Regions:
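Positively charged, low-complexity terminal tracts
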Residues: 1-62
Length: 62
C-alpha cells in the first residue's frame, strides 16, 4: 500500500515545498515536491518529536 504525501495547505499550488508522510512504523519521511523521485529524509518517531519540540521551543530561530 502506498502512503500519501502531504504538504502544507499554505504552500499554494506550485511544486515548491516540503512534503511529508508518516509510515507504518511511526517514522516520518520528508521529500522535495520538485523532485518526487529524489532522496527521502527519514526520521524515527523520537527524532521527529525532538525536532518538533525544538522548533516549537525556538531552538532553531535565527
Amino acid at each position: 500500500m502506498k502512503k500519501t504525501w502531504y504538504k502544507s495547505s499554505r504552500s499554494g499550488g506550485a511544486d515548491n515545498c516540503v512534503e511529508a508522510r508518516r509510515v507504518g512504523d511511526g517514522s516520518v519521511q520528508l521529500r522535495d515536491s520538485k523532485d518526487p523521485d529524489g532522496p527521502v529524509l527519514a526520521f524515527t518517531p523520537s527524532e521527529w518529536d525532538a525536532f518538533i519540540g525544538g522548533a516549537k521551543g525556538g531552538e532553531f530561530d535565527l
